[in-house]
């Protein structure tokens, strides 16, 4: 009966996470044909290039706390006093980091010509960073109440969709795209914080300096791993925007968004299993889901291969003919992502091997940067090279994690 209850909780949490992630990604994707047609491919490329820069900044604000805090909340879920201390110290630490980053970001806008010329865009996309402070997803994930995450994220999606077609009418309205996304994120974050305080009854207490330092130090290993992961995920769009132009950045952005959407079910299952495996540390349970994820991913990749031309045509029309081949080239990356995520979080971290988890990400970044150095040395720059670098770095991470899962007798 206990085993059935565990499976029931995981299934429910996976369902809630999958619903919101599908809605959260499906709505912008459904709006993508309208956005590209209205603001143009180059303006869309400029927007996602700016957002790729913000992705690095968000990692600094989170500082690995979105991982370390999930484990702490999960392990102390029945201790209200300890939970209040954890929540307060995490929010306070993030706010301090946000203040520092805001100052540095403002300086960059002033001194870097390309950012100064588009200061409105870079200022608008930065608004979204507030969401990382006020929305305690790590708490809801730790206590396994994914339905709250679903409800809160729906607010952001609903706001964006309901306002997009009202405010974005011409090419000159491209700034409204990131603005509406940012406002929706902040509104949903505020709602999530209110639920934490008034529904979950978590009290905010002023954390001591020592507790903030401890929270900060707990996040350090995960910060570097998350920074490395973000480099892996965003470097293709960033480099395309710098070296190839905003049109190619737009193509890579659309292709990556399609692949990310396809990877959502596996990612959500992994997110739902992580707190459960952290709590139980059941090797048989871990191995069973690993086999299931592998089989599901193989089936998904085969189906995706045949559907990609229709999906690209729906999203981008005939404005991005190269996106079909680029997206198909990304399929190996799609195959690796859920497995890498599962063995990393539910395997290495959940069973107390965070060092191996972090090292695997450092190695993947090293592989990717090495490939980019090779591209520079040979003057070989194109979208397929960037996708190949992404995929090979993910493969190196998978190999390393599986070796250590084998070493620790997890598989």
Regions found by a protein language model. Give the residues of each.
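Hydrophobic alpha-helical transmembrane segments
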Residues: 126, 150-200, 256, 363-367, ...
């Amino acid at each position: 009966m206990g085993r059935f209850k565990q499976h029931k909780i995981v299934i429910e949490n996976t369902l809630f996470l999958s619903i919101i992630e599908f809605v959260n990604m499906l709505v912008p994707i459904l709006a993508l044909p309208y956005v590209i047609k209205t603001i143009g491919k180059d303006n869309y490329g400029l927007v996602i290039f700016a957002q790729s820069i913000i992705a690095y900044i968000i990692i600094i604000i989170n500082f690995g706390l979105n991982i370390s805090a999930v484990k702490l909340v999960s392990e102390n879920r029945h201790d209200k006093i300890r939970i209040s201390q954890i929540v307060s110290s995490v929010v306070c630490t993030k706010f301090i980091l946000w203040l520092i980053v805001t100052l540095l970001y403002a300086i960059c806008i002033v001194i870097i010509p390309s950012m100064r010329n588009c200061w409105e865009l870079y200022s608008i996309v930065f608004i979204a960073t507030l969401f990382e402070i006020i929305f305690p997803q790590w708490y809801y994930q730790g206590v396994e109440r994914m339905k709250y995450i679903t409800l809160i994220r729906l607010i952001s999606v609903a706001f964006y969709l309901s306002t997009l077609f009202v405010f974005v009418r011409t090419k000159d309205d491209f700034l409204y795209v990131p603005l509406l996304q940012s406002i929706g994120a902040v509104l949903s974050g505020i709602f999530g914080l209110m639920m934490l305080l008034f529904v979950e009854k978590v009290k905010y207490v002023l954390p001591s300096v020592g507790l903030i330092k401890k929270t900060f130090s707990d996040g350090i290993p995960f910060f570097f791993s998350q920074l490395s992961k973000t480099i892996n995920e965003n470097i293709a769009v960033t480099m395309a925007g710098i070296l190839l132009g905003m049109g190619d950045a737009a193509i890579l952005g659309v292709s990556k968004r399609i692949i990310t959407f396809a990877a959502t079910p596996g990612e959500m299952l992994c997110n739902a299993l992580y707190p459960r495996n952290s709590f139980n540390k059941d090797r048989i349970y871990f191995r069973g889901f690993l086999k299931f994820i592998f089989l599901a991913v193989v089936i998904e990749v085969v189906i995706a291969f045949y559907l990609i031309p229709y999906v690209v045509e729906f999203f981008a029309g005939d404005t991005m003919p190269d996106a079909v081949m680029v997206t198909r080239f990304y399929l190996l990356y799609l195959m690796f992502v859920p497995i890498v995520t599962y063995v990393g979080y539910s395997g290495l971290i959940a069973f107390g091997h965070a060092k191996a988890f972090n090292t695997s990400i450092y190695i993947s970044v090293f592989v990717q940067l090495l490939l980019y150095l090779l591209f520079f040395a040979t003057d070989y720059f194109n979208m397929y090279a960037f996708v190949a670098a992404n995929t090979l770095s993910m493969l190196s991470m998978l190999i390393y994690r599986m070796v250590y899962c084998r070493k620790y007798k997890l598989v």
